[in-house]
């Protein structure tokens, strides 16, 4: 399949076949699969790094439409690089997880800022993705943010979660309610083979 060269477009093209053909096995060539490759992408193009990092958790970049648009925006993001949306109660109203991506040095003040942004934007949770290892004070700051109590799943989720790129490459996932509606789902393929 020939696809666009942005990591935002690659992410969408990667999700769709997995949804349509859950048993199919395929490989995406050209996106980072190691920390070294991720560091190089961050040096080459910070925005592409952000979009790629967001794709690791299936978050929609800020500025991309909820209908699955491939267009993200560059520029002032008010402390938010991406969004995950989920539905976890009978109102069917989407709730938000705000995502911030950092490729440089990180500190506890960035976690405090994310906590403030989550409150200001009336989101339910926040995720901080970092290329560098988080500091002890960062982890402590995230822990003091408390929990989001999901009415539909009757359980608590950490309100602020920190992930390294290494953890995400190893398969670690955001601990959030299962009703993820960030991107429009592709229909599963029916029948024995592809149709035209």
Feature-to-residue mapping (PLM):
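Mixed-charge (Asp/Glu-Lys/Arg
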Residues: 1-196
């Amino acid at each position: 399949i020939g696809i666009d060269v942005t990591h935002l477009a690659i992410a969408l093209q990667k999700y769709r076949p997995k949804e349509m053909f859950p048993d199919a096995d395929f490989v995406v060539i050209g996106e980072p699969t190691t920390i070294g490759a991720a560091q190089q992408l961050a040096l080459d193009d910070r925005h592409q790094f952000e979009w790629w990092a967001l794709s690791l958790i299936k978050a929609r970049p800020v500025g991309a439409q909820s209908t699955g648009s491939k267009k993200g925006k560059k520029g002032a993001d008010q402390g938010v690089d991406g969004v995950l949306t989920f539905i976890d109660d009978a109102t069917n109203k989407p709730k938000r997880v705000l995502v911030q991506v950092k490729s440089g040095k990180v500190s506890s003040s960035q976690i405090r800022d994310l906590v403030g942004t989550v409150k200001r934007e009336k989101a339910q949770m926040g995720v901080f993705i970092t290329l560098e290892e988080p500091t002890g004070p960062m982890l402590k700051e995230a822990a003091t943010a408390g929990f989001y109590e999901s009415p539909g799943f009757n359980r608590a989720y950490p309100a602020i979660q920190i992930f390294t790129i290494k953890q995400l490459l190893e398969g670690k996932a955001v601990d959030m309610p299962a009703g993820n509606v960030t991107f429009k789902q592709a229909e599963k393929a029916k029948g024995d083979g592809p149709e035209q």
